[in-house]
UniProtKB/Swiss-Prot annotation:
This is Alpha-crystallin A chain. Residues 1-63 are annotated as: Required for complex formation with BFSP1 and BFSP2. Residues 52-164 form the sHSP domain. GO terms for biological process: lens development in camera-type eye; negative regulation of apoptotic process; protein refolding; response to heat. It comes from Osphranter rufus. Zn(2+) 1 binds at residues 100, 102. It comes from the Eukaryota. The keyword Manganese does not apply. The keyword Transferase does not apply. Contributes to the transparency and refractive index of the lens. Acts as a chaperone, preventing aggregation of various proteins under a wide range of stress conditions. Required for the correct formation of lens intermediate filaments as part of a complex composed of BFSP1, BFSP2 and CRYAA. The gene is CRYAA. It holds the Pfam family Crystallin. Residues 146-167 have a biased composition (Basic and acidic residues). InterPro entries: A-crystallin/Hsp20_dom, Alpha-crystallin/HSP_16, Alpha-crystallin/sHSP_animal, Alpha-crystallin_N, HSP20-like_chaperone.
Length: 173
């Protein structure tokens, strides 16, 4: 099968809002018609974008919330088990690392690895941080904020990932 290379001057109808899946974290998870023939699918039906936002919403994008009382990170890690995840607090950062060895899926064999690093607000009580993984693969990292009259404790430590049996509701802004 011959696949033409897309020239840099050729832009998709929605530009950067419509990312290609050929070279991102979806590599190896199967291709859609618009991945191979983006100009053809937009020419035939410019309003037909079956999975335009599905890939964005399911891409492992994290959401960070910092309100008056707590600091929370939501991260989609549906391809990882708690044993595959390492969560550490180092200085004023939280580091989340996931890695699983090669395993078989619908499209062949795949191994995955990611590393995310987030800066913690200075008023997060690092001794009270918790981390859990829901049944639908949403990792929730949370730490309470302390008020200015109390002193935040800072130390390097690993945070255990506990498993929850119920799915996490999709984070809403």
């Amino acid at each position: 099968m011959d696949i033409t290379i897309q020239h840099p001057w050729f832009k998709r109808a929605l530009g950067s809002l419509y990312p290609s899946r050929l070279f991102d974290q979806f590599f190896g998870e199967g291709l859609f018609e618009y991945d191979l023939l983006p100009f053809l699918s937009s020419t035939i039906s410019p309003y037909y974008r079956q999975s335009l936002f599905r890939t964005v919403l399911e891409s492992g994008i994290s959401e960070v919330r910092s309100d008056r009382d707590k600091f929370v990170i939501f991260l989609d890690v549906k391809h990882f088990s708690p044993e595959d995840l390492t969560v550490k607090v180092l200085d004023d950062f939280v580091e989340i690392h996931g890695k699983h060895s090669e395993r078989q899926d619908d499209h062949g064999y795949i191994s995955r690895e990611f590393h995310r690093r987030y800066r913690l607000p200075s008023n997060v009580d690092q001794s009270a941080i918790s981390c859990s993984l829901s049944a639908d693969g949403m990792l929730t990292f949370s730490g309470p904020k302390i008020h200015s009259d109390m002193d935040a404790s800072h130390s390097d430590r690993s945070i255990p990932v506990s498993r929850e049996e119920k799915p996490t509701l999709a984070p809403s802004s």
